[in-house]
Amino acid sequence: MIVPSIDISGGRALQLIEGETEALDAGDPRPLLEKFSVVGEVAVIDIDAARGEGDNEGLISELCNRARIRVGGGIRDIDACKRWLDRGASKIIIGTAATPELLRQLPKERVIVALDSRGGKVLSHGWRRTTESGLLERVEELRDQCGGFLVTFVEHEGHMAGTDLTRATEVVAAAGRTPVTIAGGVSTPGELEMLDRIGADAQVGMALYTGELTLGDAIAAVLRSDRADGLWPTVVVDEAGVALGLAYSDATSLNTAIETGRGVYHSRTRGTWVKGETSGATQELLAVDVDCDRDTLRYTVHQHDGFCHTGTRTCWGEDRGVTRLQRRLSGIGLSPPPASNTARLLREPPLLAAKLIEEAGELAAATEPFEIVEEAADLLYFLLVKLTAAGSTLEAVEDILDRRELRVTRRPMNRKPEES
């Protein structure tokens, strides 16, 4: 699979040839992250920190709150590792500082060891110094102590003339069961397919920036189909992961969906089909994922109105639970019925605040299992009203919790002193 890359220097997204010559200035990295993150994790590399020439910590910390990113560049000690993990980096990328002693202190699954190579030797200091370490020997030494490798063939980086597939195959074999991502020169769907077949991901920058490769073509490259028409089943889910229905995609609809940020599919009768174009039940595309067998897509969407042609939320009828309640409360906020208690809470913040405090106290005092569940339901309702009043959602709360789970430094769980 593809891992889009954003290299940052001086607050701007740059593309360099062999890590030195500036070939392209893509400007503000934020729009790039928004575009790239639809297909999964994005690698964000601090070029300045890697070279020891300043850093872009503030900007990259902000990017950690926007998407799942792998952060690399200048991470050389345990304090820097923990700092980035606490800031919400899904993974950290460590270069020549990745010693067994350092790796033992970190959550293995969230550490990628970067091995930048030229002529089979490992480089350091932002690709400017050659070490005596052999690439394959280094992989074998560290493979049981990290969650993955990022191997960059520096002599191919930025040229878009192809990567070293032979050396990539050797790296994957040396890594054993540890995942490998290859960077340097990858620019065609064929290379992505070959790398996927040998069990490696591809980190791609220049080819995406220049338009030589699209995100849609990158995903399509690894997909296969046993259907006569070559279509890929596409499971459509909402932000909560609730299945809305099943559709089909081809390369054209996949590319169009990613480029436009909408739910676009392939209809066997109508060809390329934009969901909601006639019905108004439109979709905002949030994520595209490929399953483990490479034969099914999953689109995560924000669905407006019902997904099914019958008007129901899903093709299996109406959904239920908290997400449905949240949508109902949002509807009341937009068009409040005159006698609605929810509408009253939305227009009287002091009343809502009092009810939240009251229900939280009742939940804290509850002791019996059923009583606890009942009080939790009461509190959850008022919590959802509070979120609705703020124009926010439970999904936003989940995002915060997901990021907090990534922290490796924990604060003590103490009671706040009571006010006198």
Which sequence ranges carry the predicted segments?
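Hydrophobic faces of well-ordered beta-strands that scaffold small-molecule active sites
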Residues: 2-8, 42-45, 69-73, 92-94, ...
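Conserved anion-binding
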Residues: 8-22, 82-157
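Short catalytic helix/loop segments, enriched in acidic residues and glycine
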Residues: 18-36
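Charged helix-capping and loop-helix junction motifs
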Residues: 25, 54-60, 128-137, 161-170
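Catalytic domains of carbohydrate-active enzymes, especially glycoside hydrolases
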Residues: 31-45, 87, 142-149
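Glycine-rich, proline-tolerant flexible connector loops at the mouths of alpha/beta enzymes
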Residues: 41-58, 151-160
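Catalytic cores of alpha/beta
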Residues: 58-92, 101-103, 166-202
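Flexible "arm" and connector segments at domain edges
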Residues: 107, 128-136, 181, 196-197, ...
